[in-house]
């Protein structure tokens, strides 16, 4: 029998085991440029391990997912973090799992608002980008360099996500 996954709102507390939520947090705000700019400082830390590795900035264009959606795989990046920040201002789904002896456990699903991003720490199991509703662009900060920075796991039985209420 298929297992359905509940969708929860994305909060810093709920996501803390997997990385950081990237959003305008008043606690991190400081005024710069003569008081004309609010800087929300150090919301996440990019990681790039390995000889010659570097942090790069990318633009990803995600196609919207159809629902119900089968979560049949997860991936992780052993040498670097990966962050996703929506440029299009559209909500998206974030699917993560705790590690259970080298494989992903039962996935957890979060609904990110269009003004929230996420930073997955190194080795965090997550599903690839899940845009909602329409084609959406994301600013992605991750690692470039030698070595295999992608590990994938395929579930024998997929988990199912029902269509989120937006």
Swiss-Prot record:
Its EC number is 4.3.2.3. Pathway: Nitrogen metabolism; (S)-allantoin degradation. CDD domains: cupin_UAH. Its cofactor is Ni(2+). SUPFAM superfamilies: RmlC-like cupins. Pfam families: Ureidogly_lyase (PF04115). It catalyses: (S)-ureidoglycolate = urea + glyoxylate. One of its GO terms (biological process) is purine nucleobase catabolic process. One of its GO terms (molecular function) is ureidoglycolate lyase activity. It is an enzyme of class 4 (lyase). Keywords: Lyase, Purine metabolism. Homodimer. Belongs to the ureidoglycolate lyase family. Catalyzes the catabolism of the allantoin degradation intermediate (S)-ureidoglycolate, generating urea and glyoxylate. Involved in the utilization of allantoin as nitrogen source. PANTHER family: UREIDOGLYCOLATE HYDROLASE, UREIDOGLYCOLATE LYASE. This is Ureidoglycolate lyase. It comes from Rhizobium leguminosarum bv. trifolii (strain WSM2304).
């Amino acid at each position: 029998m298929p297992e359905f996954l509940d969708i929860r709102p994305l909060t810093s507390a709920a996501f803390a085991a997997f990385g950081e939520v990237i959003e305008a947090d008043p606690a991190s705000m400081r005024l710069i440029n003569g008081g004309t700019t609010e800087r929300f400082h150090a919301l996440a830390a990019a990681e790039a391990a390995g000889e010659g590795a570097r942090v790069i900035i990318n633009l990803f264009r995600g196609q919207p997912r159809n629902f119900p959606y089968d979560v049949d795989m997860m991936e992780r990046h052993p040498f670097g973090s990966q962050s996703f920040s929506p440029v299009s201002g559209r909500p998206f789904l974030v699917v993560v799992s705790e590690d259970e002896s080298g494989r992903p456990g039962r996935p957890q699903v979060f609904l990110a608002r269009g003004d929230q991003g996420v930073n997955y720490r190194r080795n965090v199991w997550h599903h690839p980008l899940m845009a909602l509703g329409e084609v959406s662009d994301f600013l992605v900060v991750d690692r470039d360099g030698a070595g295999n920075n992608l590990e994938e796991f395929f579930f024998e039985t997929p988990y199912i996500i029902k269509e989120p209420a937006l």
